[in-house]
Design a protein with these regions (language model features):
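Terminal, low-structured helical/coil segments at or just beyond the last alpha-helical repeat
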Residues: 31-36, 199, 203-205, 212-268
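Structural marker of alpha-solenoid helical repeat scaffolds
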Residues: 62-63, 96-97, 127-131, 164, ...
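Helix-start (N-cap) detector for alpha-helical repeat units in TPR-like alpha-solenoids
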Residues: 67-68, 101-102, 134-136, 151, ...
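Canonical tetratricopeptide repeat
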Residues: 72, 106, 139-140, 174, ...
């Protein structure tokens, strides 16, 4: 009971503690969102991010005006956690190529990575058009609006994305987290279960569902969700992560009173 009353207090000051996994390029280049969004910097899962930065950086420095080289370098920097540098590279490229929507999408995402949410939203708006909307960018715009506390507006963007790709799990997952941030945990669970049941959901959806179930006090059920059908080592890691995230809601010093959000999902 104490945990649930504590949750209610912390939810009152909810803020997103999340990673934007946002697949933002007009092509299928995704890197780490949202949701959704995980642009993988066009590397294999076993690639060394530092090596990718080195290789793409050499190509970029050889021709800084090359839009594709700038895009690849920016994505590699983001994947390596060098967010400020990624934003700087993508900003310069966007200035040099103002009509390149893939660059605008990546730049908007990089701005969001750095906490510049309003600027990110404005740039993302230029990355697609009303007559040719990109559902991935719509979902990312939703996550940015959620970061700004504009949850009703965010859900309009998720709804627009879902009209293009019905039942897309990455969008549903972001929508579910939006409900978490506005303290509607039953609706969040319902939405995340729908995402999880699709058979196309990634590990973040599983983690987010487990987190929402745990936030409602059903800890045994939450553990069973995050470790189901996984090898023992991965199951143990997921359970440890769940406990870490849940502990943050009861420890004001660990998260500034924020509700923990496992991760936003990025459409691939």
């Amino acid at each position: 009971m104490r945990q649930q009353s504590s949750l209610a207090r912390h939810l009152a000051s909810a803020a997103v503690a999340a990673i934007f996994a946002v697949g933002l390029c007009g092509c299928q280049t995704t890197s780490d969102v949202t949701g959704s969004l995980m642009p993988k910097a066009e590397a294999s899962p076993d690639a060394d991010p530092r090596r990718t930065v080195e290789v793409s950086g050499e190509r970029y420095r050889a021709n800084p005006k090359d839009a594709d080289a700038a895009l690849a370098y920016g994505q590699a920097l983001r994947a390596a956690g060098q967010r400020s540098q990624a934003a700087a590279v993508l900003e310069q490229a966007s200035i040099a190529h103002p009509g390149n929507k893939a660059l605008l999408a990546a730049f908007g995402r990089a701005l969001a990575d750095n906490g510049n949410f309003q600027a990110a939203f404005d740039v993302l708006t230029r990355a697609h058009t009303p007559d040719n909307p990109d559902w991935r960018i719509l979902s990312v715009q939703g996550t940015v609006l959620d970061q700004l506390g504009r949850h009703d507006e965010a859900r309009d963007y998720y709804a627009s994305a879902l009209r293009i790709v019905p039942d897309e799990p990455s969008v549903l997952s972001n929508l579910g987290l939006s409900y978490v941030l506005s303290r509607d945990l039953p609706k969040a669970e319902e939405t995340l279960r729908k995402a999880y049941a699709s058979g196309r959901a990634d590990a973040r959806v599983r983690q987010n569902l487990g987190l929402v179930v745990g936030l409602q006090g059903r800890f045994a059920e939450a553990e069973s969700i995050v470790k189901a059908d996984l090898p023992p080592d991965q199951a143990a890691a997921n359970v440890a992560y769940l406990k870490q995230m849940l502990s943050r809601k009861d420890n004001p010093r660990s998260g500034s009173g924020r509700v923990p959000v496992a991760s936003l999902n990025a459409p691939d």
